[in-house]
Regions:
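Amphipathic alpha-helical hairpins
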Residues: 3, 10, 14, 18, ...
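Rossmann-fold NAD(P) dinucleotide-binding segment
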Residues: 51-114
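Short amphipathic alpha-helical segments
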Residues: 16-18, 41, 74-77, 101-104, ...
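NAD(P)+-binding Rossmann beta1-loop-alpha1 motif at the extreme N-terminus of oxidoreductases
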Residues: 1-57, 61-64, 123
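Rossmann-fold dinucleotide-binding core
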Residues: 95-170
Length: 170
């Protein structure tokens, strides 16, 4: 699969590395910290310079692994018009109480499929591919994402209804 990744940082590096290990083509974009980007490019990822270049790469999936809801929403608003319904957004961001529901609303404007999957564990577990994941979204979107989730998640808790994932965080 062709996979994009926004947020290759502390947690994202290990997740991205495992996506590569499982023979998926990975496209990444840098933000503030060059070190994880340089490392993942050495592992075989392709670096792109803009959201437009990333979103126009014919992606099957786009991972979002950023610090919080406001950052995720800002990125969502920038990419929504660049993606098509052929790309599912898999959101690993740890959102605030309504963050993932708001993110899904942002993407719905252009019919972009969305799956929330906050993870349990840290950078070590991410690199080992043994994170826990709580998945929220439609069954169809879960099926589309399952192969990629298995690259880095050992235990998947499926809540299907997006709002249920948020309630589990509090």
């Amino acid at each position: 699969m062709k996979v994009g990744f926004i947020g290759v940082g502390w947690m994202g590096f290990g997740i991205a590395k495992n996506i590569l290990k499982n023979n998926h083509e990975l496209f990444v974009i840098a933000n503030k910290n060059r070190k994880p980007i340089d490392r993942i490019v050495k592992e075989g990822a392709k670096e792109v310079k803009s959201y437009e270049e990333l979103c126009k790469s014919g992606l099957d999936a786009l991972f979002l692994c950023v610090t919080n809801s406001p950052i995720a929403h800002e990125i969502g608003k920038k990419i929504v018009s660049l993606l098509t319904d052929k790309t599912i957004v898999i959101d690993i961001t740890t959102h605030n109480q309504n963050g993932s529901v708001e993110m899904e609303e942002i993407l719905k404007v252009n019919n972009i499929p969305y799956l929330e999957c906050p993870v349990m564990g840290g950078p070590v577990q991410a690199e080992e591919g043994v994170l826990g994941g709580i998945v929220g979204g439609s069954e169809e979107n879960l099926k589309r994402s399952e192969e990629l989730l298995k690259c880095f998640v050992k235990i998947i808790i499926i809540l299907v209804v997006l709002e249920m994932v948020q309630k589990q965080n509090y």
